[in-house]
Amino acid sequence: MKIKLICVGKLKEAYLRDGIAEYQKRLSRFCQCDIIELADEKTPDKASDAEKQQIMAKEADRIKKKLGQRDFVIALAIEGKQLASEQFSHLLSEVTVKGYSDIAFVIGGSLGLDQSIKNRANLLMSFGLLTLPHQLMRLVLIEQVYRAFMIQQGSPYHK
């Protein structure tokens, strides 16, 4: 299985990079986990709604180039479905049973995701109504992916 985290924006904070690298290392015994960073567009102060839409559309074009035609796409969006860790673990195992070998998670930039990416997604997923920096969300997501595999293994990691 191959898991891709497609993220808009560069990760600058060393402590987040270190945490993500640790979970990538842990995940290597279960799957190949690639993190793909895409350039984000600069958003001018007081950008109009039209300008924001244009920015999200440009970012969406970059995202689409990284999505495989047969990827199972999970886009993170505040309006998405909230799952308990056990449900998330079950979802990941079900995806492979359905014949998908690649799962792509998409984390948008500061403005969120363009509707075209949400439409392409097989699932919109939310980690709750809290607003988190998209850089921090990467660490939260990769930890939950690792937790999902540990749940499948019956490991005491998940308590």
UniProtKB/Swiss-Prot annotation:
GO terms for molecular function: rRNA (pseudouridine-N3-)-methyltransferase activity. SUPFAM superfamilies: alpha/beta knot. It is found in: Cytoplasm. One of its GO terms (cellular component) is cytoplasm. Its EC number is 2.1.1.177. S-adenosyl-L-methionine binds at residues 76, 108, 127-132. Pfam families: SPOUT_MTase. It catalyses: pseudouridine(1915) in 23S rRNA + S-adenosyl-L-methionine = N(3)-methylpseudouridine(1915) in 23S rRNA + S-adenosyl-L-homocysteine + H(+). The keyword Secreted does not apply. Keywords: Cytoplasm, Methyltransferase, rRNA processing, S-adenosyl-L-methionine, Transferase. Homodimer. Specifically methylates the pseudouridine at position 1915 (m3Psi1915) in 23S rRNA. PANTHER family: METHYLTRANSFERASE, RIBOSOMAL RNA LARGE SUBUNIT METHYLTRANSFERASE H. Belongs to the RNA methyltransferase RlmH family. This is Ribosomal RNA large subunit methyltransferase H. It comes from Streptococcus equi subsp. zooepidemicus (strain MGCS10565).
